Amino acid sequence: MEFRAETTLTYGGRNVIQLPNLARELKRRIKNRSAKAGVMGLGYVGLPLALEMAKEGFQVTGIDLSKEKVDTINRGMSYIPDVPSDIVSAFVSNDRLRATQSLGAVGELDTINICVPTPLRKNKDPELSYVVAAVEVIRNHIRPGQLIVLESTTYPGTTRELVMPILEESGLRAGTDFFLAYSPERIDPGNSTYQTRNIPRVVGGVTSRCAEMAALFYRQFIEKVIPV
């Protein structure tokens, strides 16, 4: 992104732009579809989400550690039963969807949705090691103005208590230098009536500006968005 700064801070030895300039620019890019969208985790939640973004004109990068998943998508094929391969193929062919194992790709993105697994432990608590690993990757490549949304199923407070402190180790601050939000995934695999697009989505942010930005983004490809 390119910005005209009015208010700046020092980050990595250089001046960067603070909100609200970052907000205006990201809103503009979201609305005109020039924002580069990314999804971390290409399972039954992440891949359908990436496709909905691509349907609405976003250029989407899917990031997954599985070489098999990445190669399958880039061949224009699906590995999820209720996701047709012809849809994947269409968006790969027109360069709206690509998959990569390169974690550094997050630094090129304007929006990042975290859709990694959170399997239950024996005590029924969610295993958050995949979330932590994903957030640490983002921390290492984060830049001002990015929108980061946690979708993985977890307990209330995870975004503020776990995700935010890790990201802020970068020296940037949520709600000031980047946007941080949570929107719990609600997909029902195999349900032909209610799918990613038409399942209402609750969206919350660590600040009101973060919530506003996340809601704006989701409204581009989700029929009903409920800010909280």
Where in the sequence are the language-model features?
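Internal alpha-helical scaffold of NAD(P)-dependent oxidoreductase catalytic cores
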Residues: 19, 165-181, 187, 192-228
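Hydrophobic/small residue at the entry helix of a nucleotide-binding pocket
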Residues: 45
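Short glycine-/small-residue-rich Rossmann-like dinucleotide-binding loops
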Residues: 116-118, 153, 207
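Conserved N-terminal Rossmann-fold NAD(P)-binding element of oxidoreductases
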Residues: 38-40
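Conserved N-terminal Rossmann-fold NAD(P) cofactor-binding segment
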Residues: 3-4, 8-36, 55, 59-61, ...
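Redox-cofactor binding/interface segments in oxidoreductases and associated redox assembly factors
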Residues: 112-114, 150, 204
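Rossmann-like NAD(P)(H) cofactor-binding subdomain of soluble oxidoreductases
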Residues: 120-186
